[in-house]
A protein has these predicted regions:
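N-terminal helix-turn-helix
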Residues: 1-82, 86, 244-249
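Short, solvent-exposed recognition segments
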Residues: 125-196, 262
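Short hydrophobic beta-strand micro-motif common in sensory/regulatory domains
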Residues: 201-205
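Sensor-regulatory modules in signal-transduction proteins
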Residues: 207-209
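Amphipathic alpha-helical regulatory segments at dimerization interfaces
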Residues: 48, 88-99, 183, 187, ...
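Short hydrophobic alpha-helical segments used for membrane anchoring or interfacial signaling
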Residues: 106-111, 119-120
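Conserved segment of winged-helix/HTH DNA-binding domains
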Residues: 71-99, 125-128
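Juxtadomain coupling helices with adjacent low-complexity linkers
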Residues: 174-175, 180, 187, 198-199, ...
Length: 262
């Protein structure tokens, strides 16, 4: 794409477009990859990336590829809703982790993806791509499916129109996923079986704030080692309900809506 053919954007808009190209599948990128995904000319991206690197928003590796810098993550932690959510949720996450020793995580909606805002993991847990700051696919994760199931029609339509495959188990049929989302909303939990990463299964439940709004999802991620993960559903549902009550007491979720955004 040339400067002339690039969509008209402000400098801030172009910088944000560059940062938005980074996600769980694109943690490290070349300039060419960033330019392609941001739909910006390479010369423009080169200038923007250089400035972002100077501000510690991006970090350049020895191989020349770039990744998100610590400044972006630190700024994200200052978002009041994420900070309060993490503070209230951590004791509940730790309780379940101590009992089962599997990774616990909390996610919120971030555009057409879910953002992992907190995760607890130990030596036995899987080394998968869900870490604090990760932006993961809504249709391939337990926490993502919960958020998607409770999202508005615009969000669901946008996601259903673009179902990337991550493993052989990833659901890429819009009709199948739409039916599953309806079931998730009714039954109150989501389960995944190696849909984002091979060897990983998950269960997730909604977290509600004031007014009954679903403002986040609580998930447990475990190795697919033959255990009946279904036995954890009641534990997760009870924990989710107790945590939701605390979130209401904390005043979170007053006007939260799960909707699509640019």
């Amino acid at each position: 794409m040339t400067e002339k053919s690039a969509p008209t954007r402000t400098v801030t808009g172009r910088a944000l477009a560059v940062l938005d190209t980074f996600d769980a599948k694109h943690r490290r990128q070349s300039l060419a990859s960033i330019a392609r995904r941001a739909e910006l000319p390479l010369t423009t991206v080169h200038r923007l990336v250089h400035e972002l690197e100077n501000q510690n928003a991006l970090v350049r590796g020895s191989d020349g590829d770039y990744e998100i810098g610590s400044k972006i993550w630190r700024l994200g932690l200052l978002a009041s809703v994420h900070s309060e959510l993490r503070e209230v949720a951590l004791p509940y996450m730790e309780d379940v982790y101590q009992l089962h020793n599997d990774a616990m995580q909390i996610a919120v909606l971030d555009g057409l993806r879910c953002l992992i805002v907190e995760r607890i993991a130990g030596s036995r847990t899987l080394e998968v791509i869900s870490k604090p700051g990760s932006r993961l696919a809504l249709h391939a994760t337990g926490v993502g499916k919960v958020l998607l199931a409770h999202g508005d029609a615009e969000l669901q339509k946008a996601v259903l129109n673009s179902l990337d495959r991550y493993t052989d188990q990833t659901i890429t049929d819009p009709g199948v996923l739409e039916t599953q989302l309806k079931t998730i909303k009714v039954q109150g939990f989501a389960k995944t079986q190696e849909e984002l990463a091979e060897g990983a299964v998950s269960i997730a439940v909604p977290l509600r704030g004031k007014g009954g709004n679903v403002i986040a999802a609580l998930g447990i991620v475990a190795p697919s080692d033959g255990r009946d993960l279904g036995k954890l559903v009641p534990v997760m549902q009870v924990t989710g309900a107790a945590l939701s009550r605390k979130l209401v007491e904390a005043g979170l979720g007053d006007a939260a809506r799960l909707q699509a955004s640019n």
